[in-house]
UniProtKB/Swiss-Prot annotation:
This is Protein irld-34. Transmembrane segments: none annotated. Pfam families: Recep_L_domain (PF01030). It comes from Caenorhabditis elegans. InterPro entries: Rcpt_L-dom, Rcpt_L-dom_sf, SPS2_domain.
Length: 397
């Protein structure tokens, strides 16, 4: 009986039906089987891990399209991540040894890589979150790294993307970042800034030069972060050209105004996109701003189309009778998944960063349990599958 042929046929049949799934709770890359397409386990690369030579790592990962676990690349000597250029899906999982994931709490962590210049995660399409994950894609303290505007757009299609003060390669707009990783405020926004790469925070701000500060706000089109004004003396806050905010502070509302005694005027007349809200549904949450009793028609229409507007201690009808027939489309604005990178969220996570109390008891509690890891095999009886069965039957009869 031709046992070698039978074994070869079984091997091909197995790979055809089930695929090249490899299991390693905390992967030692040099021991990973060849030709893995799916890895069930946690990948750690950097000085804190025992890494084989780069050529071996590249060879072991070149066919990987899906990782069920997490990826941590920290303190590495990589200049790019092209070795993961075929990776399409990362799904967070706590199976096996999860110590590597819990050290950062993210699905994809790329941090403290002093030589890293480019990502080249060109095939990445989907990031699947769970309530255990702090962030989906987390980029921090990679001083030489820049991402393209296209990559930024891809990553902003996901929830829980976090990359404060990221550098942009060959930008077509004026992206403003701070080397000291502070929040933007009334003093440090450069003239002509179109994109803020972190949150705008006016916390206890005194003696604001209103005209000069407003002139800097006029050019801002996007904010990668939130807007927080707390116990400030500012009287007017206008963003005539701001059209998109991606919330890097998920424990705060997108726009948070609290205890500002002089604030009487707010404008968001062009804000039309909030790809990620965070844990609060409110697009604007205001509390204890005694002079802020009215919003313009354009601001009311835009904010109402994005999500709830909450004014504590003021009539909830602050925008009532000031909106036209604009129909709210919150789902569309929140998911932002029209194409490219997609994110599935099982349960929202939390962020340890909080600037102040927002006067609420916290985000609504969600008791949904983590979905257990499962696999679904698609036994499609196509011609190739039948071909192998017929040969197997012929050998044994």
């Amino acid at each position: 009986m031709q046992w070698p042929l039978i074994a070869a046929l079984f091997t091909q049949l197995y790979h055809f039906v089930i695929g090249d799934d490899c299991y390693c709770p905390l992967c030692e890359l040099d021991k990973l089987p060849d030709n893995c397409t799916t890895i069930h386990g946690h990948i750690q690369m950097g000085l804190e891990s025992t890494m084989p030579p780069f050529e071996i790592v590249e060879y072991k990962l070149e066919n990987v399209t899906k990782i069920v676990g997490c990826i941590t690349i920290a303190n590495s000597g990589f200049t790019s991540l092209s070795l993961l250029s075929n990776l399409e899906i990362v799904q967070y999982s706590q199976t096996g040894n999860s110590s590597t994931c819990s050290s950062y709490g993210n699905i994809i962590t790329i941090a403290k890589n002093s030589l890293l210049r480019r990502l080249y995660l060109t095939s990445l399409k989907k990031v699947i979150l769970s309530k255990k994950a702090e962030y989906g894609i987390y980029l921090l303290d990679n001083p030489s790294l820049c991402i393209t505007e296209g990559e930024l757009e891809q990553f902003m299609q996901t929830e829980k993307f976090h990359a404060p003060h990221i550098q942009i390669c060959d930008p077509t707009k004026n992206y403003c970042r701070l080397d000291n990783f502070e929040f933007f405020n009334d003093k440090n926004i450069p003239v002509g800034c179109q994109v803020l790469t972190d949150s705008l925070v006016l916390n206890g701000t005194k003696e604001i030069n209103g005209l000069e500060f407003q002139s800097r706000l006029n050019d801002i089109e996007q904010i990668l972060g939130s807007i927080t004004v707390f116990e400030s003396e500012i009287a007017s806050l206008k963003f005539p050209n701001l059209w998109r905010v991606y919330n890097f502070q998920p424990d705060l509302p997108v726009i948070f105004l609290q205890e500002n005694g002089n604030l009487s005027e707010v404008e968001f007349s062009n804000l039309t996109s909030i790809p990620y809200f965070g844990n609060y549904p409110d697009v604007l949450y205001a509390f204890s701003n005694p002079l802020l009793t009215n919003l313009s028609l354009d601001t009311c229409e835009n904010l109402n189309s994005l999500g709830p507007i909450t004014f504590e201690e003021v009539s909830n009808s602050i925008c009532e009778n000031r909106t036209s027939s604009v129909v709210p489309n919150q789902d569309k604005n929140r998911t932002g998944n029209s194409g490219g990178l997609i994110v599935d969220v099982e349960v929202s996570g939390t962020n340890s960063t909080a600037l102040s109390s927002v006067g609420k008891d916290g985000p609504p509690e969600n008791n949904t349990k983590d979905n257990s890891v499962y696999r679904v095999f698609d036994f499609n009886l196509n011609l190739s599958f039948l071909f192998y069965l017929l040969i197997f039957q012929k050998l044994f009869i």
